[in-house]
Amino acid sequence: MKKIGIIGGTFDPPHYGHLLIANEVYHTLELDEVWFLPNQIPPHKRNRNVTSAEDRRKMLELAIEKEGYFSLCLEELEREGPSYTYDTMLQLTKKHPDTTFYFIIGGDMVEYLPKWYNIEKLLELVTFVGVARPGYTLQTPYKILTIEIPEFAVSSSLLRERYKNKKTCKYLLPEQVQSYIERNGLYES
């Protein structure tokens, strides 16, 4: 059986925090790969303007290009409508029956698990891996694996705000992602 970690998100933009989480879980659980799963329309962020799927895909490709065990999974970007993890994982488990999936989530999402669409059935498809995040406990009524990682308190919303206010983002996200953002004028207003 292959062991694949999945880290889902908007990745608007992807940053070193995402890469750190993926790398730590990869090594701790001795995974074969980690797939980055950018979502089309996250159900919990429907009212927020999200950078285009194409720009987010390109930034994510740039962010993970140097790591052989990181891959891009476009399952949700290629599907219209809201991105429900249950629907995605149902498709992926059918396509990859020889794989055990570990779905990686931050502490903020661990607390939100009871509200996830079809959570009981989703728990039959994946093992959730909760990663500690500042300000959140890993409390949930569900059985999950928990992993402590070095704290890196950066978020995509912080980066968007810094770009909007013309502050430096150096050392917070990969240089090639930073160049892409600047070249394409993302997050300027």
From Swiss-Prot:
UniProt keyword list: ATP-binding, NAD, Nucleotide-binding, Nucleotidyltransferase, Pyridine nucleotide biosynthesis, Transferase
TM spans (from-to): none
Pathway where this protein functions: Cofactor biosynthesis; NAD(+) biosynthesis; deamido-NAD(+) from nicotinate D-ribonucleotide: step 1/1
EC top class, as a word: transferase
Any single GO BP term: NAD biosynthetic process
Annotated GO MF terms: ATP binding; nicotinate-nucleotide adenylyltransferase activity
Stretches assigned to coiled coil: none
EC numbers: 2.7.7.18
Catalytic reaction list: nicotinate beta-D-ribonucleotide + ATP + H(+) = deamido-NAD(+) + diphosphate
Highest taxon in the source lineage: Bacteria
InterPro entries in alphabetical order: Cyt_trans-like (IPR004821), NadD/NMNAT (IPR005248), Rossmann-like_a/b/a_fold (IPR014729)
Keyword Nucleotide-binding among record annotations: yes
Family statement drawn from the similarity comment of this UniProt entry: Belongs to the NadD family.
Function: Catalyzes the reversible adenylation of nicotinate mononucleotide (NaMN) to nicotinic acid adenine dinucleotide (NaAD).
Classification via PANTHER family: NICOTINATE-NUCLEOTIDE ADENYLYLTRANSFERASE-RELATED (PTHR39321), PHOSPHOPANTETHEINE ADENYLYLTRANSFERASE (PTHR39321:SF3)
Protein name: Probable nicotinate-nucleotide adenylyltransferase
Name of encoding gene: nadD
